[in-house]
């Protein structure tokens, strides 16, 4: 019995007309391709792929296209038709709150120094030990990729992470024992970082998946702007509140912001974003094992592993003395919280400006010389703390407040900016289907290297005798830190010389497997079958 299938491109069934009559020669196919390329300024109804043609309804209008072949008008129309407003509110608020986390952390640092009277090394140990949940980000990413909660695999994880943060910061704001007893305070901070890491992984995966699905550019820039805006406002608000209110008020205000994010997350429906549902498998454990195997295979490639090793080692081998410097600024120099908060604001603005400069001017430069310059500047910028500790700035007529405002955050900003070229490179080389896993693995390894750096700093502070009543050897520790930051320049050969060359699909051609996957429907016709066999034989000869 002859079986006739539906061609979804034409939506016609059981028709005697031969709509897929093959061309006579390969020359005819080349002419048709040239004609299609000459019409690249025409915005036609539907997409080249039938899967996308059934998703959007695009107007037939002539408009100039961008580099990706999608006009700004079409991009805006798609964004509105496929849940763009909902994802803007959900992720925009999420990244803004994520950037605002510096606001309660500033209050927490002052609380641990003044109320709990922690030593500088103990303060730094608590700060970075509580970041351990961030190390497990790849696990959260794999679970979010393969395990559905209800009808979604992104938004429910965002809601769960936000709820954990509300529980942690709300407890520290309401219950005195949760913030006055160190073990309970550490437990609350661990719970908060666990929720933040789950939320960040799910949110990053949602933005990446949505942008790739609908070929919408600029979502990452939008996320960065929202996070930077949250950081600026969070530091301003944190410095102001600490001058007039106790730290618990800052915890409660941030809990209110998280509650707003939780309401938005619970009211968002992932189905409205039009994202495809992955095929269900017999076992979730098998899917997790497969995803972990793919991640392991991806990071073993030299193009990914070598620059990742350099980035991780260059952070881990530098002993961090941020806790000691913070205690010195607040206990010896008696700087107001508003001054420290404003210095963080200036640092966030500097980071945003550096990111824009990199995207426009520095992205095309060879990677190895660029990283070499950034690392050299980072090692030298650490000496700015040496100038502050030795009070050399007063000899030039620069007060401590002005000096901290202008130069205190420079080393921290350069350390963050150094990661950007590596993140761009790894994102451009991620195998298909492993984007979220590889990026979360990068984030977790960088977090682990920062924890190792903090522990080395604690050991160095104890070795040279830095305490809350004795900062005489802090300048020596800063010199050691600066020399350690210059040491990674000795193995710059691990950093690639240039960015990977990504060929466009139109230039490199389409493989036989891709052609086979792009065929739509099937019409039982001897001429069509014969033509397909002849075409495959021609490709094999080529």
Curated annotation (Swiss-Prot):
Residues 1-78 form a transit peptide. InterPro entries: BT1, FBT, MFS_trans_sf. Keywords: Chloroplast, Membrane, Plastid, Transit peptide, Transmembrane, Transmembrane helix, Transport. It comes from the Eukaryota. Pfam families: BT1 (PF03092). The keyword Acetylation does not apply. The chain crosses the membrane at residues 103-123, 132-152, 155-175, 181-201, 223-243, 246-266, 308-328, 338-358, 369-389, 404-424, 446-466, 477-497. Residues 509-521 have a biased composition (Basic residues). It is a multi-pass membrane protein. GO terms for cellular component: chloroplast membrane. Its main location: plastid. Residues 522-542 have a biased composition (Basic and acidic residues). Residues 24-45, 506-542 are annotated as: Disordered. The keyword Kinase does not apply. It is found in: Plastid, Chloroplast membrane. Could mediate folate transport. NCBIfam families: fbt (TIGR00788). Belongs to the major facilitator superfamily. Folate-biopterin transporter (TC 2.A.71) family. This is Probable folate-biopterin transporter 8, chloroplastic. The lineage of its organism: Eukaryota, Viridiplantae, Streptophyta, Embryophyta, Tracheophyta.
């Amino acid at each position: 019995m002859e079986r006739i299938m539906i061609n979804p491109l034409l939506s016609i069934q059981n028709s005697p007309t031969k709509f897929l009559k093959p061309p006579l020669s390969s020359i005819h196919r080349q002419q048709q391709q040239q004609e299609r390329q000459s019409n690249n300024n025409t915005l036609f109804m539907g997409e080249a792929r039938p899967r996308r043609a059934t998703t959007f309804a695009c107007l037939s209008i002539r408009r100039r296209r961008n580099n990706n072949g999608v006009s700004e008008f079409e991009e805006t129309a798609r964004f509105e038709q496929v849940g763009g407003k909902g994802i803007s509110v959900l992720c925009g608020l999420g990244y803004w709150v994520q950037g605002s986390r510096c606001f309660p952390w500033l209050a927490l640092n002052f609380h641990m120094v003044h109320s709990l009277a922690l030593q500088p090394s103990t303060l730094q140990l608590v700060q970075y030990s509580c970041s351990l949940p961030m190390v497990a980000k790849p696990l959260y990413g794999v679970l979010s990729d393969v395990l559905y909660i209800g009808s979604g695999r992104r938004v429910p994880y965002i809601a769960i992470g936000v709820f954990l943060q509300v529980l942690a910061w709300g407890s520290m704001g309401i219950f005195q024992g949760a913030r006055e007893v160190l073990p309970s305070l550490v437990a609350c901070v661990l719970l908060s970082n666990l929720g933040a890491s789950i939320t960040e992984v799910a949110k990053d995966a949602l933005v990446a998946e949505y942008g790739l699905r609908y070929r919408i550019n600029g979502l990452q820039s939008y996320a960065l702007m929202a996070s930077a805006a949250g950081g600026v406002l969070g530091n301003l608000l944190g410095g102001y509140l600490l001058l007039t209110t106790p730290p618990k008020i800052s915890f409660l205000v941030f809990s209110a912001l998280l509650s707003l994010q939780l309401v938005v997350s619970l009211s968002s429906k992932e189905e409205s974003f039009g994202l495809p549902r992955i095929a269900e498998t017999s076992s979730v454990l098998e899917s997790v094992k497969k995803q972990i195997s793919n991640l392991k295979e991806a990071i073993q490639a030299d193009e990914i592993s070598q620059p990742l090793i350099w980035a991780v080692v260059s952070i881990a081998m530098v002993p961090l003395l941020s806790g000691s410097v913070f205690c010195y600024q607040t206990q010896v120099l008696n700087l107001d919280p508003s001054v420290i908060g404003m210095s963080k604001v200036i640092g966030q603005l500097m980071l945003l400006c550096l990111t824009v400069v990199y995207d426009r001017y520095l992205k095309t430069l060879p990677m190895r010389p660029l990283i070499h310059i950034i690392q050299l500047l980072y090692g030298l910028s650490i000496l700015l703390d040496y100038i502050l500790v030795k009070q050399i700035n007063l000899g030039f007529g620069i007060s401590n407040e002005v000096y901290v405002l202008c130069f205190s955050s420079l080393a921290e900003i350069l350390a963050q900016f150094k990661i950007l070229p590596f993140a761009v490179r790894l994102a451009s080389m991620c195998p298909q289907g492993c984007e979220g896993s590889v990026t979360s693995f990068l984030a977790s390894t960088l977090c682990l290297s920062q924890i190792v750096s903090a522990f080395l700093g604690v050991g160095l502070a104890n070795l040279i005798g830095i305490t809350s009543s004795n900062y005489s050897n802090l300048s020596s520790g800063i010199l050691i830190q600066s020399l350690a930051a210059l040491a990674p320049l000795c193995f710059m050969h691990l950093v690639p010389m240039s960015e990977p060359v990504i060929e466009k699909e139109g230039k490199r051609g389409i493989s036989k497997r891709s052609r086979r996957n792009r065929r739509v429907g099937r019409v039982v016709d001897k001429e069509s079958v014969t033509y397909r066999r002849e075409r495959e034989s021609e490709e094999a000869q080529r």
